[in-house]
Design a protein with these regions (language model features):
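Glycosyltransferase catalytic domains, chiefly GT-A lineage
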Residues: 1-332
């Protein structure tokens, strides 16, 4: 196995550019709440990315939403390369209190063509250009199994404004990323055991209870050798994040979305590989939690791991069909 290694010169260059961008967010782009609200005409709704096969998937996802009683309006974001789906957008979608939002109607053509956005990068752009102030984002192949109308009237959402769900894989974001965003990690303070940040640390790490019996050097060696990086104070929580569903207050987390956009624009060059180290699922999925963490904005990631659904085709031949994520408010 190999460790992610980003030399100090590159780290410093990335840190400097990152700092300039976050300074811009807190300066020129630090819009007031009324200014942010004026950018979005809608109130609350559901957003998904369509276009091509994703519009076909969105068709079944939207029917499922209505079957479960969800009445929130829906916006399907259509990327530039997939415009022209008139029957879906103009005839079918309005029957389900939905409409299409075209990139080309909102984003000027030259910046859009210059950016050369790929699939992963389209999602955060879609979240920003949707007209709603508060959104439930769902991937087109994501099916709600309960009514989502009350999602915005929950304690967890009101406390944080950003709800995320865990992925299958452990978080492997390297120290280099934390150096770039200017976030310090306390290598002498363990705050969780994977996703469990409620139980006393001594329950899963007896060393902590007896730490006074050891020298400072021995304590440091213990944390460096035996404690995962993302169990330490100052890091993003384990597990890694999944972006197939998110609940976002775009007014409160306006800068979070802009920084996530920054990570995605420079994702193929730097941040996708850096944040996920080439593991399965590398892409936009961890850029949202990374942006909130970098800006010290509140967020809640569901602690309960997802479950698999599927069947055994033959003995010892399990066919996975779906992932089942948990109710975020019950988890909170």
């Amino acid at each position: 196995s190999k460790c992610y290694n980003l030399n100090k010169t590159v780290q410093e260059s990335l840190r400097e550019v990152h700092s300039k961008f976050t300074d811009t967010l807190s300066g020129k782009l630090n819009f007031s709440i009324p200014q942010r609200e004026a950018l979005f005409s809608g109130s609350e709704g559901i957003v998904t990315i369509g276009g091509g096969k994703y519009s076909v998937l969105a068709y079944t996802m939207i029917k499922k939403l209505r079957d479960t009683g969800t009445t929130l309006p829906i916006e399907v974001i259509i990327p530039p390369q997939d415009e022209g789906e008139d029957d879906f957008c103009k005839n079918w979608l309005p029957k389900f209190n939905g409409k299409c939002i075209y990139f080309s109607d909102i984003v000027p053509s030259k910046p859009l063509s210059d950016l050369k956005l790929t699939h992963f990068q389209l999602k955060v752009f879609g979240l920003i250009i949707s007209s709603f102030k508060r959104i439930i984002f769902l991937d087109a192949d994501n099916y709600a199994v309960k009514n989502l109308d009350l999602a915005f009237n929950t304690t967890s959402f009101n406390d944080t404004g950003l709800i995320l769900w865990p992925d299958f894989w452990r978080r492997v974001t390297p120290p280099a990323f934390y150096n770039i965003i200017g976030s310090s990690i306390d290598i002498g303070k363990r705050v969780r055991f994977v996703s469990d940040d409620i139980s006393p640390v001594s329950r899963y790490d007896p060393f902590v209870s007896n730490s006074n019996d050891y020298t400072p050097k021995e304590r440091q060696e213990h944390f460096l050798k035996h404690v995962p990086l993302h169990d330490l104070d100052g890091t993003m929580p384990d597990l890694s994040s999944e972006s197939g569903q998110m609940v976002i207050d775009k007014i409160r987390h306006f800068n979070t979305l802009l920084l996530a956009l920054y990570y995605n624009v420079y994702g193929p060059t730097w941040y996708y590989k850096m944040i996920s180290q080439g593991t399965a699922g590398e892409g936009d999925k961890d850029t949202f939690v990374a942006a909130a963490h970098a800006l010290n904005m509140p967020y809640y990631q569901v602690r309960t791991k997802f479950e698999f659904d599927g069947f055994f085709y033959q003995k010892d031949d399990y066919k996975g069909l779906a992932l089942l994520q948990h109710d975020f408010e019950q988890d909170y």
